[in-house]
């Protein structure tokens, strides 16, 4: 039995179209389906999903808690002592659409968050004396910093889970 000459190319074309229209969202990801660059659908649950081949593409964003390790910065305390403060933060993407529209990707988000966190650390720790920064009141200062950063991060579709001072040197 002879197979028609057009059957094999037709099967290949259909296979490519089916392959291009399916995508899998892993449990650790959330996805935004874009049509010509405009967001059309937000997918937060894991599973097999469909899109229009060659017209729509998919951007995957992490659902997990992500780490941000800031570069050490100099902070001048209220008693004019200079400190080198090294801070870390943990954050997660809570609004994928707002995140995609405001920052676009994780690299830009990290840069913006780093700037926001550094300014809030300087603002809050700059009003405190060195003895206060080294005492148990430091957890209160971190809570103030976290709340301040969270209000700004909400506009980026991000939630700050934790802000900590990893190291503070004179």
Listing of model-derived features with the role each one plays in the protein:
Residues 63-78, 103, 143-147:
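N-terminal post-signal-peptidase region of extra-cytosolic proteins
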Residues 24-36:
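Membrane-proximal juxtamembrane linkers immediately C-terminal to transmembrane helices
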Residues 2-22:
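Single-pass alpha-helical transmembrane signal-anchor segments
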Residues 39-41, 75, 96-99, 130-131, ...:
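Short beta-strands and strand-coil junctions in structured, solvent-facing domains, enriched
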Residues 79, 85, 91, 109-170:
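Amphipathic, coiled-coil-like alpha-helical scaffolding segments used for oligomerization/assembly
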Residues 47-60, 100, 105-123, 127:
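Flexible, solvent-exposed short loops/turns enriched in glycine
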Residues 2, 39-40, 114:
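Membrane-proximal alpha-helical signals and transmembrane carboxylates
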Residues 35-67:
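Short extracytoplasmic
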